[in-house]
Amino acid sequence: MEPKLRISSDIVAIKTISYLSELINTSDIDNISANIAANMITHHIDYDYLASRIMISNLHKNTKDCYYETVKTINENMDNILMDKLIKFAEVNIDFIKETIDYKKDYTFKYFGILVLIKSYLLKKDDNVFERPQHMYMRVAIGLHLDQIDTDGS
């Protein structure tokens, strides 16, 4: 079980409410809440954990939880940026990859770490992020070893 955070989530909620409007979506509310929590890190370091958890939760809410579906979506939206061999490997090994990826590990990032990943390393088009940190790690690991991998499953 995660240790209890020593912060006031009420303060973050009250400050977030002041930014709400009728047309705002839940993803924007999450981003506002995460930014408010991040701005309170100087009051207590646990606000960092709150901010990062909100960011990761929002990222998970807006991305697919299947690696194969993620790489297909990336390729469809980003002009076939990924190698066919990587996509084929993901398709053939869908169950193994699903068992291997532990999305809870995404929650180990601190706020500024996840911000850097989102801004610079996770594949996205415009402001639409397609992958989670664990997807990025899997994409890099498979890509590094593609020449040593049998993609037809035999």
Go through each PLM region and give its residues.
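Extended catalytic cores of very large enzyme megasubunits
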Residues: M1-S154
